[in-house]
């Protein structure tokens, strides 16, 4: 059976060349007589796998030596609690709420200290990133007042299709970012952040691995709370090389393959060029369409998640059903917002996006305003 055009928001499409490599090595990894699935995480062979994955990621992102790279489990959701557990030393952190996942992180942090709402776009149904001048002014005021342990953002909002195109100016306050759905989609200056993390299942690999990149000084004294579970202690995880317990060995192996694929296909600058070409093909179509309309403000558009709708729930459902008949899968919008969403992550090809665009045009020709008025 031919592969479908997969626009899933995560777990998402993987590069076909990576899938082929994994299949080729499944029964016998490089002549060792066993699968990576069967390999001890304490073996020298597996240590080489995890070391290579980290080294490749460090090259891709030019990660400075004073940052640790961790391969953890529990997804972004575990980090909603893990970040305040490790960083909320004064008991006060700032949150910018631009969608569902940022809001979850904000509410979770409030269990451990004062979570200060610095800005939100909930008043316009999260269709934008708040004005950066207002964000920066609020950060400066809070930092000068009672202080902030960190400022937290979700850099790309998978559900609502928005993205920061400019980072907040946090001064000496560490910036913490969930970059799950934009990780490795374009260049990123790690030194602008105190901590970033990403669920691997969108752009970096298979579900089950969370990549955490954290600056040494933020974890040097251990977690902020004595009762922090050992697994959540980032200092301990760093000291143990992500092997405090058995890690997701196969997931990390897949991540390493994806990191290498990104590097071999031109790195992050080339990836960004391809990704914006894919996204802009759909954004341009939406601007010209009389049937479909995008749901985000133009200056906040995501590189990865393009959200749109017709304004008619029944027509949206018909579009999704028809897409499946054309081998176009996973374009139904998130259950919280409805409509449609095309996630055009790294492994989604221009051919995939062109197939979707062609179907959108054909659907509009059949169901557009001119047809409904006849």
Give the positions of each predicted feature.
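Conserved active-site segment immediately N-terminal to the catalytic lysine
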Residues: 176, 190-201
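PLP-dependent enzyme catalytic core of the Aspartate aminotransferase-like
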Residues: 2-4, 334, 338-374
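Active-site phosphate-binding strand-loop segment of PLP-dependent enzymes
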Residues: 10, 109, 121-183
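A glycine-/small-polar-enriched, mobile loop at the entrance of the PLP active site in fold-type I
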Residues: 3-54
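Conserved PLP-anchoring active-site segment centered on the Schiff-base-forming lysine
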Residues: 88-103
């Amino acid at each position: 059976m031919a592969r479908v055009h997969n626009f899933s928001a995560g777990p998402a499409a993987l590069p076909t060349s990576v899938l082929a490599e994994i299949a080729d090595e499944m029964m016998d990894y490089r002549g060792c007589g066993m699968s990576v699935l069967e390999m001890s995480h304490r073996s020298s062979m597996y240590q080489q796998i995890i070391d290579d994955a980290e080294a490749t990621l460090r090259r891709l992102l030019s990660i400075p030596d004073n940052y640790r790279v961790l391969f953890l489990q529990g997804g972004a959701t575990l980090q909603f609690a893990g970040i305040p557990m490790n960083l909320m030393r004064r008991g006060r952190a700032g949150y910018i709420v631009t969608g569902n996942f940022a809001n979850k992180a904000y509410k979770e942090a409030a269990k451990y200290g004062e979570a200060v709402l610095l800005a939100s776009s909930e008043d316009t149904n999260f269709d934008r990133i708040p004005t950066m001048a207002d964000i920066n002014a609020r950060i400066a005021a809070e930092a000068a007042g009672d202080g902030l342990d960190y400022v937290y953002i979700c850099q790309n909002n998978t559900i609502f299709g928005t993205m920061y195109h400019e980072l907040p100016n946090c001064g000496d306050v560490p910036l913490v970012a969930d970059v799950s759905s934009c990780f490795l989609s374009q260049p990123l200056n790690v030194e602008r952040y105190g901590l970033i993390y990403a669920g691997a299942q969108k752009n970096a690999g298979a579900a089950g691995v969370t990549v955490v990149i954290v600056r040494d000084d933020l974890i040097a004294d251990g977690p902020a709370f004595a009762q922090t579970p050992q697994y959540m202690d980032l200092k301990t995880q760093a000291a143990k090389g992500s092997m405090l317990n058995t890690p997701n060995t196969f997931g990390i192996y897949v991540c390493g393959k994806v990191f290498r694929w990104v590097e071999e296909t031109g790195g992050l600058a080339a990836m960004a060029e391809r990704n914006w070409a894919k996204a802009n093909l759909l954004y341009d179509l939406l601007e010209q369409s009389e049937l479909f309309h995008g749901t985000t403000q133009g200056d906040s558009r995501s590189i990865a998640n393009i959200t749109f709708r017709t304004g008619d729930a029944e027509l949206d459902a018909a579009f999704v059903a028809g897409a499946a008949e054309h081998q176009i899968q996973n374009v139904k919008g998130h259950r919280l917002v409805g409509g449609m969403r095309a996630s055009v992550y790294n492994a989604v090809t221009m051919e995939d996006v062109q197939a979707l665009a062609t179907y959108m045009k054909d659907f509009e020709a059949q169901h557009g305003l001119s047809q409904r008025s006849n």
